């Protein structure tokens, strides 16, 4: 690694890198790869291509036609998920409470990482269960906080250089609900729970759960693993807004967005990253296959939920969350139906209130012809495997000028 420097080589996005080298990578390693990794690469390779289906728009002014193709919407695809992440942030920001927040991170010790990478579904489940329970056990201790926490946990598996480094971030309100649910018990402003005690408790819970669910695994792990302390970091994060924004970036993505890499003259790829300690930009140079290997380490099991809520933030704990808001004197949250039926004071029943402007809503913008600027008309849509020409309402449109291959 070295400090980032200028280079005259070409620039490629992460998606372009994957599409350029994935076919050769699959040809060489595909037979030995987990089927889930092959599935993800195939989705990325076909993202926004005719294989995904698409739509045809037509310009009635200059007879131009324009194809657009559907996204794969795979959460590992670097060019998908941007709008969903913003929507998730918009939906979760109103749930933040007017209290101090903490970002608590549990990191798996090195001795366990190889086993978890080989058993990702069970390993990640145990990690989330053990770390969340460790937080609750200590918080509920009357000598600590004496309260039940509300936790928002997000699993990450990568470092800034895409190495395998499984860890869980928890966004935690600084306080909790008393056992009798009659009191909000606030934590100290800059301190939530002791990290050494959290580390020991998480390790114990993980070991006990693994022994119960997969006892044979204990024989494959060196005993010294259970003497290693799990790294736990806890930091006050103010209102929680910035931490929530950070977590939102990777709720619908894995490891990286669609950033740019430099293609060096010797064929290596230059990956830029910001050093976590100094904050300075640095880089690491990787062979294309090594970049793909690192990227694929972070493919999640099919259907796995990397975002989970615990305590009174769990979907089944809505009554307790309402109680928390009442104790903090916060107006109750309204459902979509309640918001639609709500009438401002003094307004006659049955009249429709003026629509509330949505600051993050995007206006509906009509597609414009790139040649003449006229509004494009939707002619046809087709699904994967369908022949777009067979769905054309006017066969004459099949010979018009196009912006790209159908």
Positions of PLM-derived features:
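Beta->alpha loop/short-helix hinge microenvironment recognizer with preference
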Residues: 1-406
